C-alpha cells in the first residue's frame, strides 16, 4: 500500500511503527459554526482510509480533535452574550449529527477537546521554555522558530524567505515575525482562561494538536492528516514545536486533501461561497455527498454544483438497485458447487486502486463495472456460492467506501413507482417531452421501462 507523503512529495510504501497497528490523527473542526461541504472532505477521505486499513486487518487508533477554545469561539460567545461552552456544545452536537449522515465511523473515533488537555499543554510549553525554544513576554509565550530544526520542511518554505516576505508585525514582543504563540495571556476578565506559570491565559491553536496527538498516540505517530490549507502554518508549526519538545520525529506520513471549489474558486467562509451540510441535507441524503466526495482522488480539487449532486444521487440509486437485485436472486438461487474467478479479479482491481494512494475514484469505477457484470451474468439460476462471493465483495467495497449502508431501501422502490406514475400522467396529458425526461431519469438510475398490455413494468438494466 502506497501513500503520498507531503513531507517527501512522493508516494511511499506504508510501514507502520508497530506491525498491523496504525495511529491516525486528523485535525478536526473549530466548533463555532455549522460545517460546510468543504469541511466534510477530510472527514470522508480519512474515514475511508481508516476503513481500508481495517479491511486489510489493521488495528486502527483514529483521533480527530475538537478545537473548543479559540478567538472565533470567544468572539461568538461575546456577540451572543453566552458562555463559550454553550457555543462549543451546540456546534459539537451539530457536527456529530452531520458526520453521522456521512456514515463516519464515530464509534471507533477518539474526539479529544482542547480544554481537556490544558495541564498537558502547560507541561509541553514549560519543556520548550526550559530548552530555550520558547520565551515569555508579559504572560504571552512564543515559540522561537530559529530553534526548530529544518523549519519549513513540510511546506518547502525557506525560513529566510518567510522573514523577508512577512508583513511588519505590529506585535513587537516577538523576536521574529514568524514566531507563534504557544500560550496567550487573558486580555480581559470575561475571557476564559486557565492558571499557568505565566499567569492566566489559554493555549495557542498550533499547540493544541501537538499535545493531544502526543498524549493519545505518542511522540511519533504513523499518519497526520488534514486539508491542504493546514500545511502552513499549522502543520509546519506542529512539527517545529513537537520535534523540539520531544526530540523525536513527529509523524511518519503527512496526508493532505485538496480543496473543494465553486466555479473553480476555493470554497470558504471568507468568500461566502460555502454550502452548509445542514442545508444540503434538505434536498440530498448525505450519503450522496459521501459518494460525490470519493468520486475524485483526494489530492485533486473537486468542483461543487447542484447538477453533480443530482448525477451522484442517480449513481447511488443504481448501486442500491443492484444491491437489492443481488439480494433477491440470492434468496432463490440454486445449491450448485460453482465458482466465478471474475469476482476475484474485481477484488484485485479494487485493492489495486485503494493501494495506490487511496484512489477511491478508480475503486468506484471498479464497483460500477462489477454491478454491470452482475446484471448481465447473474440471475436466479446462478449458483448460490457464486452469488455469496459476489455479495461479499459488494459488501466489502461498500464498507470501505462507507456507502450502501442502509438495509431498508423500500424508499428507492417507492421513488421509482412514483416516477412511473408521473410518467403515466404525463403521457395521458400528451406531455411526451416530460414523459421522456422521466424515462431518461429512470434510465440514469439503472431502471428500464417496458410498456405491456398489462401496464408499465420496470427492470434493472445491464
UniProtKB/Swiss-Prot annotation:
GO terms for biological process: cysteinyl-tRNA aminoacylation. Zn(2+) binds at residues 27, 209, 234, 238. ATP binds at residue 269. It catalyses: tRNA(Cys) + L-cysteine + ATP = L-cysteinyl-tRNA(Cys) + AMP + diphosphate. GO terms for cellular component: cytosol. It is found in: Cytoplasm. This is Cysteine--tRNA ligase. It comes from Finegoldia magna (strain ATCC 29328 / DSM 20472 / WAL 2508). The gene is cysS.
